[in-house]
């Protein structure tokens, strides 16, 4: 976990109804638009878009790769465009968290985080073993699938009400908050996960190990 000088994201209230976005909605699920996950686009993108008829500020999103080698090759393409490596690549949780994080090895993954010039984070992950949870996700949804998108909000509880009205249900009894971030996974009937993330004033940590462990465990609890 690193504490970064992330930019404060503010909405452009004049954002057009149709904007270029890395995401495509299909039958309730999100997929990546291959035209807009290239470094030339993501390093100039504002991290604002529309999702499920809601204008949102994206804190981070996850791109999943078949292997760590492919993850690293993709990351290298960003270096000439001003993106910064802020974490990884390494194995989560054992090489990320100083405290003992007790999650089954089925939920471990290779992880890397890139900071874009606009202040948004692009998280890259890959299975750590054949047949693990991340590998099964890829086989079920395909490599274009979006595992989750994290929407930055001012108040997680208030935002959760908005998204529950869009038929996204919380995947755990409460939001996770171990002191640095407040985060909550919600999922719609199609199986798409969105994350609501509230960054506490003065804290711009990339993630909280206990929170992430809780989020990962919530995926197998539903």
Which sequence ranges carry the predicted segments?
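Solvent-exposed serine/threonine-rich low-complexity stretches and specific carbohydrate-binding patches
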Residues: 89-91
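Long, acidic/serine-threonine-rich intrinsically disordered regions with weak helical/coil propensity
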Residues: 93-100
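Glyoxalase I/VOC metalloenzyme domain signal
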Residues: 1-87, 101-171, 180-222
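A short beta-turn/loop motif at secondary-structure boundaries
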Residues: 176-178
């Amino acid at each position: 976990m690193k504490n970064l000088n992330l930019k404060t994201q503010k909405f452009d209230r004049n954002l057009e109804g149709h904007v270029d976005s890395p995401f495509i909605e299909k039958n309730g699920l999100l997929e990546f638009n291959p035209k807009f996950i290239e470094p030339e686009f993501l390093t100039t993108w504002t991290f604002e878009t529309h999702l499920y008829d809601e204008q949102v500020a994206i804190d981070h999103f996850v791109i999943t790769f078949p292997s760590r080698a492919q993850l690293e090759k993709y990351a290298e393409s960003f270096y000439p465009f001003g993106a910064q490596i802020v974490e990884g690549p390494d194995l989560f949780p054992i090489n990320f968290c100083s405290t003992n994080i007790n999650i089954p090895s089925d939920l471990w993954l290779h992880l890397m985080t890139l900071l874009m010039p606009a202040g948004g984070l692009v998280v890259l992950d890959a299975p750590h073993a054949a047949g693990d949870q991340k590998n099964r996700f890829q086989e079920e949804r395909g490599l274009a699938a979006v595992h989750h998108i994290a929407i930055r909000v001012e108040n997680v509880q208030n935002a959760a009400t908005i998204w529950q009205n869009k038929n996204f249900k919380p995947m755990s009894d409460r939001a996770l908050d171990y002191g640095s971030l407040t985060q909550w996974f919600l999922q719609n009937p199609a199986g798409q996960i969105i994350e609501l993330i509230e960054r506490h004033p003065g804290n711009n940590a990339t993630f909280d190990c206990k929170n992430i462990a809780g989020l990962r465990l919530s995926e197998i609890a539903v």
